[in-house]
C-alpha cells in the first residue's frame, strides 16, 4: 500500500513539475500559435488512436515509437509498468486487446509537454485474466527531437 502511494505521489509530482516548468505563453503568442496548437492536438489524438491500434495488433515496433524509453505507467491494478514490459507482453499469449472503443479525449499542451485525458471501453486480457471494462486514463507526452513521445501514463478501471 505504501509503495503504491509513493509511486502515485511520485507520478503526480513528476507531472506537476513538468507542467510548472514550462514558460507561460503571452496573450499575443496564443493567437499566433493557435493553428500549430490545433495541429498538435490532432496529432496527439492520432497518436492515442495509433497506440490502441498497435496494442490490438501486438505491434511492438509501433509501440516502441510511441513510448519513450523512460515511459512508466501506473496501471488500473496499482502496478507499475515499463516500456520493456509492454513490448515483451506483445509476445505473450495471455495478453490481448480484442476490442477498443475510444471515448472523448481532452488535450492540453504546455510548450513541449502535453497531457491527454480520455476514456475507453475495451475487451481485454492480462496474464490470462479478463480485464475488460471501461477505463479513464491520463497520458503525459514530451516532444523529443520533433516527435511526441509518451513518458508517463495512469489508468483507472471504472466499477461496473
State the predicted function of each range.
Residues 1-22:
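N-terminal export/membrane-targeting signals
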Residues 8, 22-160:
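A beta-strand edge to alpha-helix "cap/lid" segment located at domain peripheries
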Amino acid at each position: 500500500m505504501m509503495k503504491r502511494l509513493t509511486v502515485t505521489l511520485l507520478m503526480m509530482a513528476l507531472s506537476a513539475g513538468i507542467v510548472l516548468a514550462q514558460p507561460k505563453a503571452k496573450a499575443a503568442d496564443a493567437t499566433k500559435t493557435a493553428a500549430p496548437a490545433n495541429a498538435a492536438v490532432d496529432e496527439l489524438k492520432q497518436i492515442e488512436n495509433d497506440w490502441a491500434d498497435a496494442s490490438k495488433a501486438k505491434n511492438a515496433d509501433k509501440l516502441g515509437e510511441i513510448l519513450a524509453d523512460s515511459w512508466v505507467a501506473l496501471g488500473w491494478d496499482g502496478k507499475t509498468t515499463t516500456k520493456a514490459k509492454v513490448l515483451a507482453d506483445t509476445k505473450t499469449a495471455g495478453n490481448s486487446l480484442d476490442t477498443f472503443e475510444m471515448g472523448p479525449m481532452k488535450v492540453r499542451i504546455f510548450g513541449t509537454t502535453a497531457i491527454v485525458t480520455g476514456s475507453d471501453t475495451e475487451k481485454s486480457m492480462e496474464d490470462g485474466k479478463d480485464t475488460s471494462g471501461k477505463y479513464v486514463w491520463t497520458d503525459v507526452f514530451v516532444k523529443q527531437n520533433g516527435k511526441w513521445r509518451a513518458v508517463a501514463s495512469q489508468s483507472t478501471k471504472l466499477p461496473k
